[in-house]
Amino acid sequence: MGKDTIADIITSIRNADMNRKGTVRIRSTNITESIVKILLREGFIENVRKHRENNQYFLILTLRHKRNKKESYKTILNLKRISRPGLRIYSNSQRIPRILGGIGIVILSTSQGIMTDREARRKSIGGEILCYIW
């Protein structure tokens, strides 16, 4: 049975966000680095740094939390894995879904790398729908 690194990163971020943790540590792979760069660029996380421990690289993510007037934390991150190893979901450029009317993003794996739905529509390419983030 193989590991699903995308599901692992999504679950780690979701659990840390629900438990109001400030940081998350995930294993560094090419796919996770691409997804984290998109999350950083879109403003879903604050900071990323690479850490080496016992000849393995890890990414330390600093999550973005929002406080309301009662000084309690409000989670602002919702992630959902779409395509998985047992059921791959593909979409062409015309049928890429919009999340909350464009507020959320769809992360796709295309022939030109991992990118958001807006970039894929602009380049008119489709691919495998990895996850939704809103």
Swiss-Prot record:
Keywords: Chloroplast, Plastid, Ribonucleoprotein, Ribosomal protein, RNA-binding, rRNA-binding. Its main location: plastid. One of its GO terms (biological process) is translation. One of the primary rRNA binding proteins, it binds directly to 16S rRNA central domain where it helps coordinate assembly of the platform of the 30S subunit. This is Small ribosomal subunit protein uS8c. It is found in: Plastid, Chloroplast. Belongs to the universal ribosomal protein uS8 family. GO terms for molecular function: rRNA binding; structural constituent of ribosome. InterPro entries: Ribosomal_uS8 (IPR000630), Ribosomal_uS8_CS (IPR047863), Ribosomal_uS8_sf (IPR035987). It holds the Pfam family Ribosomal_S8. Part of the 30S ribosomal subunit. HAMAP family: Ribosomal_uS8_B. GO terms for cellular component: chloroplast; ribonucleoprotein complex; ribosome.
